[in-house]
Amino acid sequence: MKTIYLVTGAAGFMGTNVCAQLLERGDAVRAFVLKGDPAVKFVPKAVEIFEGDLCSPEDCEKFFAVEPGTQTVCIHCASMVTINPNYSEKLIAVNVGGTENMLNAAKNHPECKKFIYVSSTGAIPELPKGESIHEVYSFVPYDDDRVVGWYSRSKAMATQKCWTPPLTG
């Protein structure tokens, strides 16, 4: 069965590198990029480009549409990155709402066999001064008081969406 890797944020640093490595392995790749993003020029030429907006559930649904007999694996790298607090609403809309839209689209497309979410170290709750942060291997409830900054909060909230079952039903 043919597999297509669906990569969001493909015009960003992480997404571009994910696309390049998948192509190097010989995989087929479809990239979700924001319409009009000038950084699309960095996406490898062999990648199928899909222009859309993560805040649009319809665009996310279209991104997952494939020919019968094709399975997909989604690697969700996309996020808005800023430390400017004036963009807090947009950060939540893109990073949390966009992730929720992608998860819903994946759930609506049974040919999507895996959904891989790229989070951030910022999503890890901060500990009191002097305590060491250790790898998190299980669900850690989101705590607004322990995640500092809107970008980190948005990534922590989006991560929580990915931990919330069921992804498949």
Set out the residue ranges of the language-model regions.
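N-terminal Rossmann NAD(P)H-binding glycine-rich loop of SDR-like oxidoreductase domains
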Residues: 4-25
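SDR active-site strand-loop-helix element
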Residues: 8, 32, 74-78, 115-121
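Residues forming the Rossmann-fold NAD(P)(H) cofactor-binding site
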Residues: 15-16, 96, 156
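Rossmann-fold NAD(P)-dependent oxidoreductase module
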Residues: 17, 21, 105, 161
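Conserved glycine-rich Rossmann-like NAD(P)H-binding loop of the short-chain dehydrogenase/reductase
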Residues: 27-36
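NAD(P)H-binding glycine-rich loop region in Rossmannoid oxidoreductase-like domains
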Residues: 38, 47, 51-97, 101
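Conserved Rossmann-fold NAD(P)-dependent oxidoreductase catalytic core, especially the SDR/UDP-sugar
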Residues: 100-150
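Active-site Tyr-X1-5-Lys
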Residues: 146-169
